[in-house]
Amino acid sequence: MSFDCDKKSPSSTCAPVIVALDYEDQKSALDFAQLIDPSSCRLKIGKEMFTRFGPQFVTQLQQQGFDIFLDLKFHDIPNTVARAVAAAADLGVWMVNVHASGGSRMMRAAKESLRSFGKEAPLLTAVTVLTSMDQSDLTELGINLTPAEQAERLALLAKACGLDGVVCSAHEATRFKQVCGDDFLLVTPGIRPAGSEVGDQRRVMTPEQAIVAGVDYMVIGRPITRSENPLETLQQINRSIQGVVQHG
């Protein structure tokens, strides 16, 4: 088992950890980025920080050498999503995502919008079932499937539309690799080092467990960003992952 640099898009690191920058102010996020070596992780910018600080915030972090996962989960009519995904590509982000529940026409339009970017296109992934959701949440929405069943259904749809992978729970990873293939990328939130608080994630795994399950990229936020020593915490996580990879 080994992590190779992703050949699907330009990248400055082979590290599987994506740190979620869930800060309320820009200075704290930039201060954190100053502590971290861009070769040790990628950074995720979500809706709150992008709405507050805009595209220039993405550019600032890129200028420090970081690959950016722009986690905006686009979900709209096909043309609107296609244009939004193309705008993200113009920013030079490493990865951008959409909601698979937007359907095949929307996902195909998003993929097509990246054609002109060629090898410079970002990875395009789809969100399946949010890791904060459980059976009761799906039932409330009129979906009579388990989270795992619904996630698999959406993952297969995303693959059929030509997307590079999905954002999913680590608990679905082993099954998704079986049905979607090893080249289909799996990005997993809900990753918590042993001893961390679960927070608002309901389906969680440790980094070591995620690697064994077949995860390609793992999103970790508060256990790193709110640690007393974020740099040391990130280094410990990377060491633990490398230990599994070397002995896997």
From Swiss-Prot:
Substrates-to-products reaction catalysed: orotidine 5'-phosphate + H(+) = UMP + CO2
Gene3D superfamilies for the chain: Aldolase class I (3.20.20.70)
Pathway the protein takes part in: Pyrimidine metabolism; UMP biosynthesis via de novo pathway; UMP from orotate: step 2/2
UniProt record, GO biological process: 'de novo' pyrimidine nucleobase biosynthetic process; 'de novo' UMP biosynthetic process
Enzyme Commission code(s) on record: 4.1.1.23
Xref: Pfam families: OMPdecase
Function: Catalyzes the decarboxylation of orotidine 5'-monophosphate (OMP) to uridine 5'-monophosphate (UMP).
PANTHER family, sorted: OROTIDINE 5'-PHOSPHATE DECARBOXYLASE
Identification of the protein by name: Orotidine 5'-phosphate decarboxylase
Organism: Proteus mirabilis (strain HI4320)
Upper taxonomic lineage: Bacteria, Pseudomonadati, Pseudomonadota, Gammaproteobacteria, Enterobacterales
